């Protein structure tokens, strides 16, 4: 069995390593001073200490390690692993353990994913071991304790950025998904960490003639860049599934390539476009790493506000942070379900 699944296991392990090695939000909120990673140290050196040279060196070191891991795992893949040996199917009824084991894995995965979300909602409703809606009342009244921005401003900013990111990302994904070379180029954000992207933004847009680091419009653009690889993967299978005969028939009837695209491609791609729109908006709503390098007082998003609230002392302040986190989960789920 191992030769048949080795490539899939190695690919999955590589993705897990990359996502853990480049994790920033969890470390920034829960790690504190005693638990620093390369990612959090890049942020500390670049933003808090202003030492872009050290931050750049760490970012380059991180990129080298990621490239080395990708190279090693690619070399270990088995070229003949796709040839499967078909055996006689066996009934699962005679071996109940084969049904129980996958079910246990699924239940464990659901529990691991759902527990933090349920705990967030619970903490937003409980203060000093008693049920309290004070955090939710403060959010819906428009005020956030210990912050200079209102909850309405934070929510509005996040939604505007998410819509703008989707408007940039989805059309670009439709264009890029047609070319394999472009797909490879625009897939780089998958293996480039948020801190590396952030330090690159600081270096590139911190001086004339491109002194755009404090511009609000740069944040949704970066969100679109981060979401683009996943949007391409959501759109590409639908584009490949369009029958070429439909396009040929449209061209035979005298339709131009643009009319063919509007009348043939777009109706078929509509479900994929909606999924890509919801996906890009969800990624924008939850993006924390690169936004931390660019956020200003007038561009505070939901993840930034949550991190600021949870990082301040006070039971009421932290409960407001949990309530805002629960609200972000509801907004994200709503966006994805509508898409």
Where does each model-flagged region fall?
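Transmembrane alpha-helix signature in integral membrane proteins
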Residues: 2, 58, 62-76, 147-184
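N-terminal signal-anchor/first transmembrane alpha helix
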Residues: 63, 67-70, 91-119, 184
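Cytoplasmic-entry segments and transmembrane alpha-helices of multi-pass inner-membrane transporters
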Residues: 94-105, 175-201, 247
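Interhelical loop and adjacent transmembrane-helix boundary motif
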Residues: 27-67, 98, 124-147, 291-339
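Membrane-interfacial helix termini and adjacent extracytoplasmic/periplasmic loops
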Residues: 27-34, 87-91, 126, 133, ...
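Hydrophobic alpha-helical bundles that form the membrane domains of multi-pass transporters
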Residues: 1-66, 239, 248-253, 259-261, ...
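C-terminal transmembrane helix and the adjacent membrane-cytosol boundary/short C-terminal tail
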Residues: 26, 56-94, 176-180, 236-245, ...
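Transmembrane alpha-helices
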Residues: 1-22, 103-114, 188, 225, ...
């Amino acid at each position: 069995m191992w030769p048949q699944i080795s490539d899939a296991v190695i690919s999955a392990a590589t993705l897990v390593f990359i996502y853990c090695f480049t994790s920033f939000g969890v470390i920034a909120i829960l790690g504190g001073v005693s638990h620093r990673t390369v990612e959090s140290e890049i942020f500390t050196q670049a933003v808090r200490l202003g030492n872009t040279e050290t931050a750049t060196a760490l970012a380059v070191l991180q990129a080298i390690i990621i490239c080395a891991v990708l190279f090693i795992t690619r070399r270990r893949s088995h070229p003949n692993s796709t040839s499967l040996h078909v055996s006689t199917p066996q009934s699962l009824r005679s071996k109940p353990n084969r049904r129980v084991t996958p079910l246990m894995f699924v239940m464990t995965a659901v529990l691991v994913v759902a527990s933090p979300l349920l705990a967030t909602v619970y903490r937003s409703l409980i203060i000093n071991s008693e049920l309290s809606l004070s955090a939710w009342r403060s959010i819906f009244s428009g005020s956030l304790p210990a912050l200079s921005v209102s909850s309405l401003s934070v929510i509005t900013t996040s939604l505007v950025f998410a819509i703008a990111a989707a408007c940039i990302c989805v059309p670009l994904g439709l264009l890029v998904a047609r070319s394999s070379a472009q797909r490879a180029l625009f897939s780089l954000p998958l293996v480039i960490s948020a801190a590396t992207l952030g330090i690159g933004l600081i270096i590139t847009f911190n001086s004339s003639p491109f002194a755009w680091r404090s511009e609000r419009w740069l944040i949704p653009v970066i969100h679109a860049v981060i979401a683009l690889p996943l949007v391409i993967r959501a759109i590409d299978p639908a584009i490949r599934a369009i029958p070429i005969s439909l396009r040929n028939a449209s061209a035979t009837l005298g339709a131009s390539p643009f009319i063919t695209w509007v009348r043939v491609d777009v109706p078929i791609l509509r479900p994929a476009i909606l999924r890509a729109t919801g996906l890009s908006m969800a990624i924008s709503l939850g993006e924390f790493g690169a936004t931390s390098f660019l956020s200003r007082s007038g561009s505070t998003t939901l993840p930034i506000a949550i991190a600021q609230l949870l990082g301040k002392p006070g039971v009421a302040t932290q409960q407001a942070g949990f309530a805002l986190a629960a609200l972000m989960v509801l907004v994200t789920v709503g966006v994805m379900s509508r898409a």
